[in-house]
Regions:
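Short pre-active-site segment immediately N-terminal to redox-active cysteine/selenocysteine motifs
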Residues: 33-34, 42, 56, 91
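Sequence/structural segment immediately N-terminal to covalent heme-attachment motifs in c-type
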Residues: 22-41
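Intrinsic, low-complexity terminal and presequence regions
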Residues: 20-21, 47
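Axial heme c-ligation environment in periplasmic c-type cytochrome domains
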Residues: 46-53, 68-103
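N-terminal signal peptide c-region/cleavage motif recognized by signal peptidases
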Residues: 16-18
């Protein structure tokens, strides 16, 4: 029984880690398409749009999921909700991987 539980826990950790390790190149392409006009090249931030480069992956995923759920959490929430709602889990992971890599 302990072996089965250890296997289940290991499998869950593997799945959660793979969800956090998105495709940087796919994230770069999606960022250029959807995010760069406001957040600047490589996520450096522009005017009232925050710097995203180098942020931790779990933080970025959490923020995008919050916006995707329709929750307002900042002054640009309406725009962010509109931009995040069409994103899939994979696209969010890809964006997070790309932005995290921009250090």
């Amino acid at each position: 029984m302990k072996g089965l539980m250890l296997g289940v826990v290991s499998f869950c950790l593997l799945i959660s880690n793979s969800a956090l390790s998105g495709d940087i190149e796919a994230g770069k392409a999606r960022y250029a398409q959807n995010c760069g006009n406001c957040h600047g090249p490589g996520g450096m931030g522009l005017a009232s749009y925050p710097k995203l480069k180098g942020k931790e992956i779990p933080y970025l995923i959490d923020r995008l999921n919050t916006y995707r759920a329709g929750t307002k959490i900042g002054p640009n929430s309406d725009l962010m909700i509109m931009m995040a709602q069409p994103l899939s889990d994979v696209e969010i992971a890809n964006l997070a991987a790309y932005l995290n890599a921009q250090k």
